[in-house]
UniProtKB/Swiss-Prot annotation:
GO terms for molecular function: lipoyl(octanoyl) transferase activity. This is Octanoyltransferase. Pathway: Protein modification; protein lipoylation via endogenous pathway; protein N(6)-(lipoyl)lysine from octanoyl-[acyl-carrier-protein]: step 1/2. Residues 47-243 form the BPL/LPL catalytic domain. It catalyses: octanoyl-[ACP] + L-lysyl-[protein] = N(6)-octanoyl-L-lysyl-[protein] + holo-[ACP] + H(+). It is an enzyme of class 2 (transferase).
């Protein structure tokens, strides 16, 4: 079940579990103020603060994880700023035509271990891509999502990075829809030399509508708002399913707190 306000008027809530999640569409926003807002939200949280998923599109920016090696920026571009941040991982690129979902969650309240959160985020991306007829997969030891067949097999289509502070997460996942991919050629994406990066449009994603001949239509930037909301719904469904399982288990066993370190940064 979804509770939603008028179109274009977020936030709205997914109420699939005991602890609802607010989904907030922030539109296009410069990276630095969005990053600052995530940190401020997390620092100000109380045990009653609702969890949120922020949907954002950023102007062109490179972000470098807290232990990132600047050498992975192979060819700096004066038009694209580089922002050092506190997530795990190396360097990645955000820009127009990309859906970014930031997950501001109380992991202890949701009985979530960090590894379970990463797995859940990846599953939500896989489910979203499947809805647009793209086959993709995880790779052991390399967080994110990669195409599993076709001419772009092995190319990365979604990057993931998190920060855990006092048991609460921020940062999240980016999914390439239809974007200028050339800025990725100036970096070793996520620290991997030669890694191909792809978007949904160039990978041949299609959606339910059909042309005059009955053929499915290709995904373009016009579908980005729909894809963003579908990803948000998939994230909320995965989180709700985990919470339901955890609560069911607690019905027959002593509650087990999801123990989190004070701070953790996960690779992208």
């Amino acid at each position: 079940m979804t509770e939603a306000g008028p179109a274009q008027a977020g936030p709205f809530r997914y109420t699939l579990a005991m602890h609802p999640i607010q989904v907030i569409e922030r539109g296009r926003e410069d990276y630095q103020p969005c990053f600052d807002a995530m940190r401020a939200f997390t620092a100000a949280r109380t045990p009653e603060t609702p969890d949120q998923v922020w949907l954002v599109e950023h102007p062109p920016v490179y972000t470098l994880g807290q232990a990132g090696d600047p050498a992975h920026l192979l060819a700096p571009d004066d038009r694209i700023p580089v922002v050092q941040i506190d997530r795990g991982g190396q360097i990645t690129y955000h820009g127009p035509g990309q859906v970014v979902a930031y997950l501001l969650l109380d992991l202890r309240r949701r009985r979530l271990m960090v590894r379970e959160l990463v797995h859940g985020i990846e599953q939500a991306v896989l489910d979203t891509l499947a809805a647009y007829n793209l086959a993709a997969e995880r790779k052991p030891g390399a967080p994110g999502i990669y195409l599993s067949d076709g001419p772009h097999q092995g190319a990365k289509i979604a990057a993931l990075g998190l920060k855990i502070r006092n048991g609460c997460s921020y940062h999240g996942v980016s999914l390439n829809v239809q974007m200028d991919l050339s800025p990725f050629l100036r970096i070793n994406p996520c620290g991997y030399a030669g890694l191909e990066t792809v978007d949904m449009a160039s990978a041949g994603a299609t959606f339910a509508a059909a042309d005059a001949n009955g053929a499915p239509l290709p995904v373009t930037a016009a579908q980005q708002p729909e894809i963003a909301l579908r990803l948000a719904a998939a994230l909320c469904e995965v989180l709700a399913a985990h919470e339901a399982r955890a609560l069911a288990a607690e019905g027959t066993a002593a509650p087990a707190e999801a123990k989190q370190p004070g701070e953790t940064a996960l690779a992208s």
